[in-house]
Amino acid sequence: MLKKLFNRKPSDTPDIDSNAIPKHVAIIMDGNGRWAKRRGMPRSMGHRAGADVLKQIVIAADEIGIRALTVYGFSTENWKRPEQEVSLLMALIKEYLNYNVKYMHEHNVRIRFIGYIGALSEELQKIIRDAELLTQNNTGLTLQLALNYGGRDEIVRTIRNITNSVVDGSITTDDITEDYVSSQLFTKEFSDVDLLIRPSSDFRISNFLLWQLAYAEFWFTDLHWPDFTKETLLEAVAAYQKRERRFGGLRDEE
């Protein structure tokens, strides 16, 4: 039943309403390794292909009017993968940023990073700081790359920070509202996610943006991330526009 409801494959390019574009889209870029395995390639080739697709999707998202695109680049759980693959992923992230930050800057894309960056190498931290500094005044789409990110970890860190603020008298417990908590998260500059996209057939959120996904619409596809295209993105947006977002309320006819 889930497959019948949620699996979508790109067909002809769908029409979308330019006045109803989701402001904040999140993507779990899944399936790189499986994509490579099906082609008899090493997993590293899948990750490289996925990095190339991200560049194209960022520009496509900006063109259709999405304001923020948050992508899952490396999770807190990914450290459990084989050391060789972790090293490859870190090298690929550095390579991606070194080769693409200037391109993104030229296309007016702002780059931000969410997650516990302090656990990454000094070299990668510098690349991250430089990318954010270079693009900080850009006014197009904001690309948020989640690196060493976990939704539970984010919430725990936020609780600690709020607790410290109460202890030092900066705030009282009465100040702790949903809006205040949102303002303390890594994603504090942006509204909650409107649309979550996950390729590669899995129906789970994998500890991604747990707070921010509270009322998001979910869209799944059998396609692996390296096969994702602008047309796939448009199909996801078109499906989103057909949904009735109720935020806990009733349907119009109920």
Question: Language-model features: where?
Answer:
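Flexible, compositionally biased loop and terminal segments
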Residues: 1-254
